[in-house]
């Protein structure tokens, strides 16, 4: 493979790796509880946190009932994309796109313009040249 193709493939894999690393499933709650108990932290603190978290979720759901459905749908999509795609992957994708575009433009500037010979012309071009010769052009 050419070095430019390998470079482009590597740059395309960068956002994918960022996406896969940051969206790895978190450890289960049971495993987290066991680790905290082993380290000596009280499990009561986790229970209080869970109650606070549930209260904020309920408040969000109750206040959401008064909004129009289109706004709720937009917020749902926004939350979905924010939670599923990490910002590092989005940034890496933009940087990759910019670098690839610059590399492709640079490659085009380096290549000399190709000169066509008569043998490489298409048959339609050859027919047009024959017509020009016939009619004295």
Curated annotation (Swiss-Prot):
The chain crosses the membrane at residues 85-105. This is Small integral membrane protein 9. It is found in: Cell membrane. It comes from the Eukaryota. Residues 1-23 form the signal peptide. The keyword Mitochondrion does not apply. GO terms for cellular component: plasma membrane. It comes from Mus musculus (Mouse). Residues 24-84 are extracellular. Keywords: Cell membrane, Membrane, Signal, Transmembrane, Transmembrane helix. It is a single-pass type I membrane protein.
């Amino acid at each position: 493979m050419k070095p430019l193709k390998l470079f482009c493939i590597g740059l395309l894999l960068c956002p994918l790796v960022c996406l896969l690393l940051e969206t790895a499933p978190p450890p289960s709650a049971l495993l987290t509880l066991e680790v905290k108990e082993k380290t000596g932290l009280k499990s009561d603190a986790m229970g209080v946190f869970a109650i606070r978290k549930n209260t904020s979720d309920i408040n969000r759901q109750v206040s959401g009932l008064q909004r129009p459905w289109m706004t709720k749908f937009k917020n749902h999509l926004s939350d979905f994309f924010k939670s599923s795609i990490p910002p590092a992957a989005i940034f890496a994708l933009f940087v990759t796109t910019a670098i690839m575009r610059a590399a492709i433009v640079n490659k085009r500037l380096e290549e000399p313009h190709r000169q066509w010979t008569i043998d490489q012309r298409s048959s339609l071009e050859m027919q047009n040249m024959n017509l020009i010769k016939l009619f004295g052009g």
